[in-house]
């Protein structure tokens, strides 16, 4: 069993990429439904606020994302989205029977801008939370950022440069993002180590087309 947590930016700066984000996410989920193994899916959409649209749903029961859920507005309260999700999933694991705790937990964080609106969590708190979950429980975190220095921003969250990548925030870049995310999720679900070149295709795209 794998715990999958998607933290998706829907702030105002994502305007114009709604259809690409929805299509990319749905294609990724469809591919995961064809892969072997069980998974639980949580999806958090964030702008000024965080909205949980899937709360540990069995993968087979995850409905398609639509424009009713994914629409752009507001600012970027990324720390609140990440901190709230870690707290929620961590508490469930803490009080669950050992046999009910998923063997693997993977967070995928996608943002096209810097944090600018959180009021419940700060960098230090979230960094400590992430470091604890990585070191004590082996959780994995991937950070995909556009229009920012993704490695530097990920470091502020306690996520290493090898788990962060800059992507091109356009139609092609968004589609590629979800293809690469799907490949990474497949590796984690198959209990294969996430290789250092998991992000190679995104890096090559940015080198070719720029940020």
Name each model feature, range by range.
Residues 1-211:
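Acidic, low-complexity intrinsically disordered regions
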């Amino acid at each position: 069993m794998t715990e999958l947590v998607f933290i998706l930016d829907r702030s105002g700066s994502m305007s114009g990429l709604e259809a690409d984000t929805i299509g990319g996410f749905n294609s990724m989920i469809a591919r995961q439904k064809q892969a072997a193994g069980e998974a639980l899916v949580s999806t958090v959409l964030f702008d000024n606020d965080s909205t949980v649209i899937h709360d540990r749903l069995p993968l087979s029961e995850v409905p398609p994302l639509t424009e009713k859920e994914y629409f752009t507005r507001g600012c970027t309260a990324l720390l609140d989205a990440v901190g709230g999700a870690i707290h929620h999933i961590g508490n469930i694991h803490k009080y669950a029977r050992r046999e009910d705790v998923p063997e693997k937990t993977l967070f995928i964080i996608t943002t096209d801008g810097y944090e600018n609106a959180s009021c419940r969590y700060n960098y230090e708190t979230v960094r400590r939370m992430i470091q604890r979950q990585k070191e004590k429980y082996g959780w994995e975190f991937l950070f995909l950022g556009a229009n920012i220095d993704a490695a530097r921003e990920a470091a502020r969250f306690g996520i290493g440069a090898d788990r962060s990548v800059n992507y091109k925030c356009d139609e092609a870049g968004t589609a590629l993002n979800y293809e690469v995310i799907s490949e990474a999720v497949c590796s984690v679900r198959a209990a294969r180590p996430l290789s250092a070149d998991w992000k190679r295709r995104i890096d090559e795209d940015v080198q070719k087309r720029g940020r």
